[in-house]
């Protein structure tokens, strides 16, 4: 009798173990069987931004970067803002701003005008006969 009872207990334990194993195997499958993300419908005029880890890229302005670099390139921290350093720093920033302004103007002028700069067209727009 005891052997039948022991066999029954063993069978129950084996069935429970088997069920637990099946449940553990089903959990990862459920994660992989998830429905794909469907775009939310939106009406005309509405703007939908998906939530999540969005990175915002900040464009650095070159002048600001140059100023920071120049400030930290100066010698020892005690002498960082002595008069000669301040004057040199101002001169460097002024030169960099002039270079940047020239480059920006050259690009904008190139985009606006296709005619060579030596032509003078002021008489073409004269309304006098």
Curated annotation (Swiss-Prot):
Alphabetic keyword roster: Apoptosis, Cell cycle, Cytoplasm, Metal-binding, Methylation, Nucleus, Zinc
Tissue expression from the record: Primarily localized to neuronal cells within several regions of the brain, including the olfactory epithelium, bulb, peri/paraventricular nuclei, suprachiasmatic nucleus, arcuate nucleus, median eminence, lateral hypothalamic area, thalamus, hippocampus and cerebellum (at protein level).
Subcellular compartments: Cytoplasm; Nucleus
GO biological process, one term: negative regulation of protein ubiquitination
Predominant location category: cytoplasm
Signal peptide (UniProt feature, chain positions): none
Cellular component GO terms, alphabetical: cytoplasm; nucleus
Ranges of Basic and acidic residues composition bias in the record: 15-36
Xref: InterPro entries: BEX, TF_A-like/BEX
Keyword Cytoplasm: yes
Modified residues (Omega-N-methylarginine): 51
Pfam family for this entry, one: BEX
Any one GO molecular function term: metal ion binding
Stretches the record annotates as Disordered: 1-37
Stretch list, region His cluster: 118-122
Binding annotation for Zn(2+): 126
Domain of life of the native organism: Eukaryota
Entry function: Regulator of mitochondrial apoptosis and G1 cell cycle. Regulates the level of PP2A regulatory subunit B and PP2A phosphatase activity. In absence of reductive stress, acts as a pseudosubstrate for the CRL2(FEM1B) complex: associates with FEM1B via zinc, thereby preventing association between FEM1B and its substrates.
Subunit description: Interacts with LMO2, possibly leading to regulate the transcriptional activity of a DNA-binding complex containing LMO2. Interacts with OMP.
Entry comment, domain topic: The histidine cluster (His cluster) and Cys-126 mediate zinc-binding.
Family classification: Belongs to the BEX family.
Protein's name according to its UniProt entry: Protein BEX2
Organism, as annotated: Mus musculus
Gene: Bex2
